[in-house]
């Protein structure tokens, strides 16, 4: 290596596409036997991932109360988990504790087995939805990585390793961006904007989800309506609407309307719309335990729901965020990544995460079920998601929050 200190990049990408029409041909329930969920290894780490998700969210929310937020805690935790395999001493401890693991309560073997099982479940074949995760390790072509690290990340985190010439920064960027673009089916492009020629490795993680509502909205009923960003700002957005059975209720504890919508497969989307002026309170109140309560209870009834079509995305610089969670050593000259390579000192210089959320009514099923003409008049309660709300995409099979976010302005992409 040309320098005494080699730099590493931790790059993450996530995509969630929630289409309210049918995106796949076979919508029948899978007959494949399921694992014993109660004894699943992934369930042992699920509470930690949920707490990590809300800890991350609160750090991001404190940075600004006027911006959209969207990220994949599973993607970020998976990348940190795989990176921890090559860390030692305080660098290692900080990552474990930063993600929320107490090593006196759960062993490292159980943690990595939990991630392994989580990834196996998320990547299993399912005709009802598209859910894919990927891990790529781009290694300087002159650097020799330890065999144990390569073996562990491959077996536990399904990582692929690629030889990369970082001195040719343009070609290296192209190689990494092509990997992410392909893995997210072209939805996330140009994740890497800048790359240092002294980089030693880039750890890239992505998650791609494309789901279909069990009960889709109808495209013909979408119309322009007001969305109240704040007391002084109103924007016009295409608002989907449907009369039907919805799991919807008002939660006094959160001062919020809570809407749960199931997607084909094992995904549930939870939307929480606080009363005006109560967003910050909800952000501080929402915990893993409260999320569990919301998921367990069913409030299905006949309602008319108006929900905005939207597509939001954003790139998060994770370095200051993770630093707030106590993960500092890995970014400093004191980093101990000697479990990755012994060729030269190594540290993570950059940690980027990009996630995209799309909610619309595209799809063949929505088109097939579209009824031309105006909606019938009804006395059913009407709820409009026309002000800022929170969103969580939850995988029921692994009990893990795949995505967490806040929609303040649906028109900001």
Curated annotation (Swiss-Prot):
Site (Reactive bond): 377-378
Region (RCL): 368-387
Record's subcellular location: Secreted
Keyword Lipid biosynthesis included in the entry's annotation: no
Signal peptide positions on this chain: 1-21
A Pfam short name: Serpin
Keywords, alphabetical: Glycoprotein, Protease inhibitor, Secreted, Serine protease inhibitor, Signal
GO cellular component terms, A-Z: extracellular space
Gene Ontology MF terms: serine-type endopeptidase inhibitor activity
Top-level lineage group: Eukaryota
Disulphide bridges: none
Gene3D superfamilies listed in its UniProt record: Alpha-1-antitrypsin, domain 1, Antithrombin, subunit I, domain 2
Coiled coil: none
Subcellular location, principal: secreted
Glycan-bearing residues: 65, 102, 123
Function as written in the Swiss-Prot or TrEMBL entry: Inhibitor of serine proteases.
Family statement: Belongs to the serpin family.
Description of its domains: The reactive center loop (RCL) extends out from the body of the protein and directs binding to the target protease. The protease cleaves the serpin at the reactive site within the RCL, establishing a covalent linkage between the serpin reactive site and the active site of the protease. The resulting inactive serpin-protease complex is highly stable.
UniProt protein name: Alpha-1-antitrypsin-like protein GS55-LT
The species this protein was found in: Ictidomys tridecemlineatus (Thirteen-lined ground squirrel)
Taxon lineage: Eukaryota, Metazoa, Chordata, Craniata, Vertebrata
